[in-house]
Every structure is written in structure tokens, then in C-alpha cells.
From Swiss-Prot:
Protein's recorded name: Epimerase family protein SAR0825
Entries under InterPro entries matching the protein: DUF1731, Epimerase_deHydtase, NAD(P)-bd_dom_sf, SDR39U1
Pfam families reported in the protein's UniProt record: DUF1731 (PF08338), Epimerase (PF01370)
Highest taxon above the source species: Bacteria
Source organism of the structure: Staphylococcus aureus (strain MRSA252)
Family classification: Belongs to the NAD(P)-dependent epimerase/dehydratase family. SDR39U1 subfamily.
């Protein structure tokens, strides 16, 4: 039986990942910030907001999946920016300290990250070979998160970092926010409309994470985005067609920045990111083009 330890296991990605893992011969320990009782013998919860939580984590953990982090979908006040950073750094460091104090380290750590690692560019195509230093607040979060995760290599753990693109899911996240203006017939181009949206269907993301965990030759950063990113204007048009709604309005960049503040960088300052490394290992995307992905999600 394989032993999993998961942070962020009750979130959008984590909950679907748990549902997939429990189909196998496994036991899953989920770290949460509040008390929960499991009605499934394959799942147990540990409240790591309480002192002594470390002693409740099984000794023989094989796989650690670190998804913990405050949502980006809130206005980035100075206080919340600190929350965004610390929620990721402190959880990752706590995991490292836990296993550093033990004789047995996990075989593999899968640590979430984001395509915000790469600088915004309308013409550059980014693959995993591109290296950079932080250039804005979001990239600093990503850079520090990955740096803290890489400490696990000192324990002999294989470290896999998944740089998530825009996750398309019916269970929350970006797609629900994107659909809202179209439901009120006011969807359209945002800013220039030329910025890239590097997206991924939630089902492909879950399968990609498990693929990387189970592939012993996988290590380092992986771009977890569909093979065909789209520019925002075409993305919006494709979404409108799937919803049978118009795509006619335009919100200037200045208005977006005034409305959203620094959070507007997630919408306006984006990157064209390609999943070369995971494809080279043989992973195949079920939803490789946007039309197919949106039609699957909108029809449900």
C-alpha cells in the first residue's frame, strides 16, 4: 500500500486528486487547518494548525503532494500579499522540517507552482529550459515556493515541480470567473486581447500529476499546460461559442488595472507556456485544444 501525504487536499485540485488516488491501493493523509472526520478508511485528516500534528502523520510516507496556498482570486492588499507568500513558504518549510527530523524521507515530493515563473511576453514561447530570477510579486512567490521545495533533494527525495497554467474546472477557479460576464452578455476582449492564456483541463492536470509521481525519471520543473495555448481574445470567443453567448465587449487594460489592482497581472501580463518536458516523457493530453476542453466542461 502506498502512503500519501497531501496539503491542499480539500481544494479544487486536491479533492479531485484524492478521488483519483483512492481508487488505487493507497492510504491518504490530508493536512487541514480545521478538524475533519473521514468516513473512508483510505483517508485520514490531520489538523496541522494544532501543536503536535507531526506525531499524527504516519512514519512511512511514500509520496508528498504539496498544493497548499491561499487563492490568488482576491484583491492583493499589502496584508493579503503577505498571506499569499507565507501560506506557500511556511507550509513547504513545515513539511521539510517534518521529514528532516525523521529517519525516512518520502520517495517523491510533488510541489505545485505556476506559469507566473516566466516573464510576460506576447511573442516568446517558454519551455522548462528557460531560467529566470523574480521580476514581480507573483514571480517572487513562485520562485521562493520552488526554492523551498527543492530542499527535499537534500533528504534524497525526488522533487517534481508542476507549474500550473489556468486550470479549467467546473468545481471553481478561473473558468467560473471567466464565464460570469458571458452569462450577463457582457463578455469580450480584455486589454489588447493578445495576451496568452496557457490553460489545462482539470482531468489532464490530475493525470499529469499522477504520471509524474509514478515516473521515476521525472524530476525538476514541468509546465502543466495544454499543448495549444490561446490568446485571450480567441479564448473568450471560444468560450462564448461553447456557452452560446456573444463575445462583443472590450475592457481596456487601464480599467482592468483600476478594478483589480495588482491582481490584474494574472489576466493581462501572461505567457505562452508549452509542456515540452512532460510530453517528452510520453504523457498524452486528452484535451489538447481549447474547443474540446470547453465543450466537455460546459456540457456538464
Amino acid at each position: 500500500m502506498k502512503q500519501y501525504l497531501i496539503t491542499g487536499g480539500t481544494g479544487m485540485v486536491g479533492s479531485q486528486l484524492v478521488n483519483e488516488i483512492k481508487k488505487s491501493d493507497s492510504h491518504i493523509t490530508i493536512l487541514t487547518r480545521h478538524d475533519q472526520i473521514s468516513n473512508n478508511k483510505k483517508i485520514s485528516y490531520v489538523n496541522w494548525a494544532k501543536s503536535g500534528w507531526e506525531h499524527k502523520v504516519p512514519q512511512n510516507i511514500d509520496v508528498v503532494i504539496n498544493l497548499a496556498g491561499a487563492t490568488l482570486n482576491k484583491r492583493w492588499t499589502p496584508e493579503y500579499k503577505q498571506t499569499l507568500m507565507l501560506s506557500r513558504i511556511q507550509s513547504t518549510q513545515a513539511l521539510y522540517e517534518l521529514f528532516k527530523s525523521r529517519n525516512k524521507a518520502p520517495k517523491v515530493l510533488f510541489n505545485a507552482s505556476a506559469t507566473g515563473y516566466y516573464p510576460p511576453d506576447l511573442f516568446m514561447s517558454y519551455t522548462e529550459v528557460y531560467k529566470t530570477l523574480p521580476f514581480d510579486f507573483l514571480s517572487d512567490i513562485v520562485y521562493q515556493w520552488e526554492r523551498f521545495a527543492q530542499q527535499f533533494e537534500q533528504l534524497g527525495t525526488r522533487v517534481v515541480i508542476g507549474r500550473f497554467g489556468i486550470i479549467l474546472s467546473n468545481e471553481g477557479g478561473a473558468l467560473q470567473t471567466m464565464k460570469l460576464p458571458y452569462e450577463y452578455y457582457i463578455g469580450g476582449k480584455l486589454g489588447s486581447g493578445q495576451q496568452w492564456y496557457s490553460w489545462i483541463h482539470i482531468n489532464d492536470l490530475i493525470q499529469a500529476i499522477l504520471f509524474l509521481i509514478n515516473n521515476e525519471s521525472a524530476s525538476g520543473p514541468f509546465n502543466l499546460t495544454a499543448p495549444i495555448p490561446e490568446r485571450q481574445n480567441l479564448f473568450g470567443y471560444t468560450l462564448a461559442r461553447a456557452m452560446h453567448k456573444p463575445h462583443e465587449t472590450w475592457v481596456p487594460s487601464l480599467a482592468m488595472r483600476l478594478i483589480l489592482g495588482q491582481m490584474s497581472t494574472v489576466v493581462l501580463d501572461t505567457q505562452k507556456v508549452l509542456p515540452n518536458k512532460i510530453q517528452a516523457l510520453g504523457f498524452q493530453f486528452k484535451y489538447s485544444n481549447l474547443k474540446m476542453a470547453l465543450e466537455d466542461l460546459i456540457s456538464k
